Amino acid sequence: MMMDANEIISFIQNSKKKTPVKVYIKGDIADIDFGPSAKTFITGQTGVVFGEWADIEAALEANKHKIEDYVVENDRRNSAIPLLDLKHIKARIEPGAIIRDQVQIGDNAVIMMGAVINIGAVVGEGTMIDMNAVLGGRATVGKNCHVGAGAVLAGVIEPPSAKPVIVEDDVMIGANAVILEGVTVGKGAVVAAGAIVTEDVPPYTVVAGVPARVIKQIDEKTKAKVEIKQELRQL
């Protein structure tokens, strides 16, 4: 079930903000206490330490006379939302996708390189999120859809009363299309590449343009052009 905006706001507000680091270190380090958050992998005079920067920074300063050299890797600061644990997701998720915690991903979905999926978003079974597409907070995509490369589904977390983007089943969204807040894209619809969708899209229609307008009903020719290939979704 999709999180509502107030649940997401509470989750972010109450989460412990984290600045995790990875430290490569050399010196007389075997007996150094790097703090309660740290995990250490030390052999002899060298090792790697994982943990919170506040703890590790204090240990580095207190033991600088023992340390010959170190390098710190850090990719976030006071982060409120961890990334989703992907190990048991029954979907194909390619390297470089960024998926935050509290995202729902259906079985046999495909998340391509560079896709970004924010907290509270839902990806239905068999849906493909293509390269560099963005699903904002609470955006919901149904089953057997294709969200094209570079497309944006606007997120809605604040104001909490705002309606999220909803994409129903069997929808094809073209590359670089933008679906604005509160829009529902009806079942079986097609959104042309580059379209900016500001109003609801009726089921089984094709919309195109800026702003997007209905240009025709789905016909057999259109169905052939936007066919979803299940072979790409097999695990």
UniProtKB/Swiss-Prot annotation:
It catalyses: (S)-2,3,4,5-tetrahydrodipicolinate + acetyl-CoA + H2O = L-2-acetamido-6-oxoheptanedioate + CoA. Its EC number is 2.3.1.89. It comes from the Bacteria. Keywords: Acyltransferase, Amino-acid biosynthesis, Diaminopimelate biosynthesis, Lysine biosynthesis, Repeat, Transferase. InterPro entries: DapH, DapH_N, Hexapep, Hexapep_transf_CS, Trans_hexapeptide_repeat, Trimer_LpxA-like_sf. It holds the Pfam family DapH_N. HAMAP family: DapH. Catalyzes the transfer of an acetyl group from acetyl-CoA to tetrahydrodipicolinate. This is 2,3,4,5-tetrahydropyridine-2,6-dicarboxylate N-acetyltransferase. It comes from Anoxybacillus flavithermus (strain DSM 21510 / WK1). The lineage of its organism: Bacteria, Bacillati, Bacillota, Bacilli, Bacillales. The gene is dapH.
